[in-house]
Amino acid sequence: MVKKFQQPRAAAATAHPAATDAALRVIYSGGNAVDAAIAAQAVICVVMPDAAGLGGDVMQLVRMPDHRVEALTGSGRSPAVAPDRWLSQGGSSVTVPGIVDGWCTASARWGRLPLAASLAPAIEIARASRASSQLIAARDEQRARLAAHGASGWSLMSTQPGHWWHQPELADILTSIAADGREAFYAGAAAQAIVDATRHYGGSLSLDDLAQHSSEVADPVSIDWQDGALHVQPAPSQGIVLAMAAQWLTRSAIDPADREHALVEATEAAFQFRDFAGRPPGRMLSEALEIDLSVAQHRAGPRGYLHTAGVAVADSEGWVVSSLVSVFDDFGSAVLVPELGFVLNNRAAGFTSGDNAPRASARPVHTLAPAMLSVGDTALGLATPGADGQVQTILQVLSRLTTGTEGLQLAELDDAIARPRWRSQDGRLLIEGDHPDQLDLSVRGHRIETRRPGDPIFGAVVAAGTTGGAPFAAAAHRRGVTKEVR
């Protein structure tokens, strides 16, 4: 059950305790939830470089006190000159990093404090050093990839669990961004260092590619959901897949005994349209999902990528942010920019075929898909890592929050997030061993693959919102995510 607090001003749920603390500190320093979300995202870039970094992207939904919702797309395009070969790692997998311009855009459009105030906690952590987390240090299998792409001298490579990890280069570039904004990153010496790193390892990114980058702010894709609206990230995000599946559920009379099976089938049917996510949302939402609940269809749409980090923040003024930051795969492309202290994304690995085929100056369909639910004066932001698992996890949580005819049941938020989950992947149905519907789903023909309860493959939901003027937050027990209301 969501806990009640006396006149709280701020609520945050994030992928790391230091990020949650930074978000709340910024609000208590006079900022709003947007300033706080930037602070949390920046801290994650410092303490979780396997998941996110300055070489990656940000997607976020912002709900304003007047109840309007806008979407920020902070992702970049592939180079204007295509590489000789498109690979899933190395320089040719890198698209223009979008997160820094995303911060600058969000701060200028919705924030209250200077960007420097939001970046201060991350700079402090990077400058003073932070104990290496078990999560980072345990990724020994990534060391060979990193070493092959110039990271042998990166301080992280020699850091053991619990030891101090020094990041002066990262602190310096963050300090420059705090002082000079996007120009400190997309021009000059920093831009040249990014270009040099990608080209040394087979990429074709240019200074012009970086200079011409800009974030996009647009309306979200919205559908009716119970007595309110569900908002998802617009293209190039695959959030439309969530909207398509959710819309089918709202328009279908489903027997409660069939609901979990129906969720799986709706997810898999919607994922057949993933590569067309860039088409007009009205056209996508008018597509008929081919769903036959008589038997499992085993459609192989969702894939097995995992990483990313979530940030959800709300304040007592009515600002709510639901966001995700990512370098895509663990440590992205594995290409280190040594002068700046971060690795670059491998978002070009998201290209597939057809509308989403690899090409120059294009944004691949993007896995980051935060969501926002609006019902009257209540707003709820939801986000989770897990690539193609994101929309599946959010759909399951939403379904558990709005069963029956009682509308949104915020009292069930913690339980809805904590309950065992499944994940459709490559024609199989991965499922937590304590899921109550495991046997029923098997009988219906799903190819069950049981995983241990709490396996990180099932995501790590962060949630924050406001109701009746009071902010609240919730978080899953998976992957060490944290929440705090203050």
Where are these regions (language model features)?
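Catalytic phosphate/nucleotide-handling subdomain of diverse soluble enzymes
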Residues: 182-270, 336-337, 342-343, 350, ...
